[in-house]
Amino acid sequence: VRLALFGPAPPFHGGIVTYLAMLHRTLAARGHELHWAGFRRQYPSLIFPGTSQTGETAGWMPAPDTARFTPWDPWSWRRTADDLRAFRPDAVIAKYWLPFFAPGFGSVLRRARGGGARWLYVLDNVVAHERYPLAGPLTRWALGRADGFVAMSDQVRADLLATVPGVDPARVADCPHPVYDFGVPGRPRKTRAQARAALGLPADARIALFFGFIKPYKGVTHLLGALPHLRERYGDAGFKLVVVGDVYGDRTPYDEARRTADCEPILDWREGYCPDEEVEDHVLAADLLVLPYVSATQSGIVQVAYAYDRPVVSTAVGGLPEVVRDGETGFLVPPEDPRALADAVIRFFDEGRAEAMGRAVAAERAKYSWDRLAETLERLAVGGGE
């Protein structure tokens, strides 16, 4: 089958790029002929809330075949659609996650479909985490003419059917986010001790990790609020919270939360974008990952943890309870509750849950394969559904 991917590609970085690169690798291994239509620009510098949109990506990631799309340039939309039509794909697979991209995506869809290709969306979320002007109409413009969808959680499916009237549920396939393995192909994994040594982390401390972009909806201030309870339980040497990620937007709430917590001896704050080839060390060095989200539809961070047999402590919001089995692969807690976060982390360590939960995660991981996603898209590409 001839398949085109449409979405950001190297040298852009971030979870969307990594997702599409791993999907590209899987589809290529399954024998499909591929074309990746990438982005020329992603966000205007004036409104980009992070520190860097481009940079080093993993060496195995393919470069895009074309890179013309700019979200605010209608001429680029036309050229992108023409590139896609010239490839003559059986289907175009696009990632959708933010209304900012909707005008361009909807326009490319309408022009590219003139060549007979089916248009498929893989949906991270339909309802944006942050408030966005005209989000509903923009999302309906982008998604309303698509031929099929992959919803990565029940929450995403429900949001799609509520937001875009007329979508036939039979055209919506359910497939959870696959696991993210950031290891370099052919390179052995480090041990926990080796990963900690490489990162300069204490060899014997209990280590919890928050990983990913630091945005308001991810609840990092509540996680910082849990630190006094963890310090009281384990002292200055027995526990470490490692926070790795780029702050999106105003950093003042995090600075204030750190001052209020007054727990710098047990906090390792590593601000900035983490290159893909450094992700593995951070996850291997940790005992568990923590997702203190205030809201969510799904999260690739759970799948990062699962790729390395690491349990999670997560808030019970959105689609997260669909992938975190409470008491088996991790613990679920209420959102916006620092004490509940602390109690779950303490329970994990004091009850010695790491080994049993790690085994449960390893068994659960089989559900979240890239081949499962590829098979789902293959069915949609030829007109099938769930």
Regions found by a protein language model. Give the residues of each.
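Conserved donor-binding/catalytic core segment of Leloir-type glycosyltransferases
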Residues: 202-218, 224-227, 241-242
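Donor nucleotide-sugar binding/catalytic pocket of nucleotide-sugar-dependent glycosyltransferases
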Residues: 144-187
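Conserved acidic donor-binding segment of nucleotide-sugar-dependent glycosyltransferases
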Residues: 326-327, 331-338, 346-352
